[in-house]
Amino acid sequence: MREIYRQTIHLVFGVLIAFSVLIFKKQLIIPLIVSIVIGICLYFLCKRYYIPIVSDLLNLCKREKEDGKGAIYFAIGMLISLILIDDIKAVFFGILVFAVGDSLATIIGIRGKLKIKYFGKTVEGFLAFFISASLILYPFYGTYGIFVALISAFIEFVSKKIRIDDNLYLPFIVAFIINHQINICSLMNFI
């Protein structure tokens, strides 16, 4: 049950941040840097001291055997995307696909029956990510959106083997692939 709360918070904040990026564009870089610094400070303070509301929220958001760094990694991943990707729509979709897809993959994957032990994931979670990402991207990018959704779902599916928190790199990878759509489509047509 805790994981469902955690993923719901992840989903809501991710969607809000994605739309904030779309509205405020690159102006979010400085506030995001400040938020990351404050988040890191609060994280270390909460490890030593109880801070009302902040400690409770962090405890609600962290997994039982993890220390709750996911939100900080997510903010850093968004910052990397904002700095390195010029196309704001690509950054928006990178964050949105990750927030929705990752949350639904976890929520649905928890109850999944078809487990792939090697990856520590379920087929149902993979499909939840792929379908949600496809529904988000297809109206704007057509079949290329489905290609991006498939690549994104696969990367999320194997993320435990990568051993780097997917909050850090997946929003950037999705934004990068969308941003380089013309080059990738040309390469696919060439092959």
Swiss-Prot record:
InterPro entries linked to this entry: Dgk1-like
Keywords: Cell membrane, Membrane, Transmembrane, Transmembrane helix
GO molecular function: ATP-dependent diacylglycerol kinase activity
Domain of life: Archaea
Record keyword ATP-binding present: no
TM spans (from-to): 4-24, 26-46, 68-88, 90-110, 135-155, 168-188
Membrane topology, record value: Multi-pass membrane protein
Protein name (Swiss-Prot/TrEMBL): Uncharacterized protein MJ1137
Organism of derivation: Methanocaldococcus jannaschii (strain ATCC 43067 / DSM 2661 / JAL-1 / JCM 10045 / NBRC 100440)
